[in-house]
Amino acid sequence: MTGENELENINENAAPLEGAEGSAGSSGAEGSDVHPIYEVPKPEEPEASAPAAPKKESVFLSDWFLMLALYVVTLAIHVLMTQVTTMFNLTPDEYAVTAVAAWFNGYDWSQTVSAGGYYGYFQSLFYIPVFWFVDDPMLQYRVMILINGVLMSFAPVIVYFLARKWFGVRKLSSVFMAIVCGMYPAYLLLTKYTWNETLCCLLPWVFALLMYKSLKSFKDTSHSSKAVFRQQLWAALAGLTLVAAYATHGRMIAMLAAGVVLELVVLFTMKRKVFAMSGFFSSVVVGFLADKMIKGYLQNVLWLKEQSDKASVNTIENTLGRIFDADPEKLMRFPQTLVGHFFYFISSTWGFGAIAMVLIISGLAMYYVTRNRAKKGAAELTADGRAKTYITSSLAMFCWFAFLVMGAIFVVSVGFKATSTVFDTRADTTIFGRYIETFFPVAIFPALIMIYRGRFSVMHSLAALITAGGIFALTELLTVPAVVGDGTTDKGVVSAMILGITPLKLGEGLKDKITETTFIKIIAVVMALLLAVVIIRLITVKKNSSMFNWVTIPMGALLMYTSLYCFDGYTVVQGKNASYGGEYVSEALEMIDDSGFDDVLAFSLKSERYVKAQFLFPDMHVRLASTLKKLNSQTARPDFIIADREDNLQLWSGDLWLVGDVNHNIHLYACTNAAREWCEEQGLELSAPASFEYSGRNIPSTSSVTRDGGAAVLPEGSAVYTNYFALYSSGGFTFTLRGTGLEQLSIALTSDKKANSIDYEIVSSDDGEMVLKFNAAAAKTENVQLKLTNRSGSPVTVTSVKLTRDSVAPLIILPATTAA
């Protein structure tokens, strides 16, 4: 078969650019349709007396310089954005990826990794060398983010290269495409963390580049060993790229499936090949088997056999199991989530998603219609007598790739989210954008090519408007009730998952509750933009002008606004929050960093805290216990325990010594005599077991309280109070207050953040000391607080507030205070 019937309607008299491959007539080799690059010819100049020497192209306008400039500018943007990153923010996603790299450097963080899900390993391989050259964990994290930037900066370069080499787009227009597709908001924002999003964004473009290289290699019909080697090389690399995508994250099975189906669709419907079949499918099979072995090994050593439920998270097996086990009464979640995903696609692209859908689907349909006409001899002919198709076969292949990969990721993401355990509690579940938006630029690119080639009519613009209107109507009918809920549950929002639509919420913060009004505002903005496109298209029809700049430049500006808005409102804020969360853990563990004791147990800490503890102190062995029962079930005594202050573990054991109370936030406990003796040798002040105590210097208070030496001085109307704490069992407890004028205090003892009062009895009050007792009836009483308020006209001083448990037994794992 030849490509004679598949030429684009381009100027046949234009000269190919320097470095272009072949000519229009040479693009018809079996399996190929790689067109040369053409510039629009300049108007003929009047004849001169002597022919002018050809003008040499400026190096600053050459393709290689523009690609270099795109890379440098993009990298500079990524580097600047990296300056606000500090520490893990999205856990366990980031931590799990980093921990795999740490494992290959000799660190075993399995005790903390196994508490979270499996998220893939391929991107972790790029982080392995960081541990060779950088010792400081904080710097390690930032270098990893810089690696993300180095990788992602290739995206606009690949987009430019494909636009120029494959589709013959002019230089300036190719730059516009590179900015829109290669600097897409998701590419800039989601790559500022050490999760797997970087390669999820980049690998589709690597695969597209290999498509071009493979099609180009088919032009060599000599069947020489060199030609065959090239064809098999590109095919094998493409297959391995698909497997690498799946090894990066489970959802990328969508790209693997799309790549395989693409080869078959092109073979059966176009009678062509994208890749050499043997090399492509062999590499997919071999790579998939290798991935299964590597994944199994890492899941075994890091996610542990006894945590198999966690190791299976984010795998296709887990998703299929959840789908087949779905509650029949909850099947409505699938159409709700599917429509929500379409809503996100259209909205986050400021309406261009609807245009892309219309152009890709109509482009494929018209390609086959005009192709069939050409076979029957009824097609329009070019000046040299060759039949024209609506779009070239190469563009049709890319449209198929975009259509298949978008369809596959929608299926996978809907499967993940419609069966999610947080469907009823998270407002972002049905409109979850993070999984799908990494592929949006792949769909935008062929649509821009078609607009550039004049394949965007008034009917296309109207169809996009109608499509968006239909999707939005279904959104209001199906998705909005699922997102907003019935009012009985306050649904939370994880902003990172829906960043693309946050600028359209108009006046609402990133974490504000999503309401019906939120949807109305987003829909109104997008429909107004699509209506503007229709109007502009009607005007340009009369003037016979192109729509490319009218669409690309405003869309690029709006997408840049999305990036800036989300960077300022989310990335910067989360960088500060991550740093704040790591400070307390760091301060606590720095107290014992040089002790020689490396066995630390994190009790009932949130994942964002214990993963930071392990990452910031990589040589320590951090293990977990979320409840007293699990703490008692430990087979060995840790050297130290870190816990949230409100847990007050020293109340529950007679052999735990409180080493430090870090900013009323984190408690550090010594668990063995050896650890306790080391603390004493270092001059660290230890609190007695089975109690906790505030001094007048550190007890929390209202603003009017002053400090005098070791006492808190309370003027009339002021108060001191304990932080909220938990009581993990029933029994008797005693508060001992010391100071002057204590009998003038109004005492309030409450639980559940002041919702309930706890009865108490003052058993003694003399000589500057007051003792009150109370009983906890429940097995667990949360958010208990003692508040002392001065209601009299005279000042009251408080020097200490101490709580003790009346009856204390050692923890099972701490049977004797003589333990080493």
Label for each model-derived stretch:
Residues 60-91, 183, 282-298, 404-413, ...:
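Transmembrane signal-anchor helices characteristic of membrane glycosylation enzymes that use polyprenol
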Residues 82-92, 105-128, 142-145, 149-150:
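Membrane-proximal lumenal/periplasmic loop motifs of glycosylation machinery
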Residues 92, 116, 189-200, 251:
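Short acidic/glycine- and proline-prone juxtamembrane loop motifs at membrane-interface regions
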Residues 159-183, 201-202, 229:
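Transmembrane-helix signature of polytopic, membrane-embedded enzymes
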Residues 178, 228-249, 260-263, 281-288:
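Membrane-interface alpha helices of multi-pass inner-membrane proteins
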Residues 215-217, 221, 254-285, 357-381, ...:
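Perimembrane helix-loop-helix junctions
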Residues 268, 275-372, 401-416, 470-486:
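Membrane-lumen/periplasm interface segments of specific transmembrane helices
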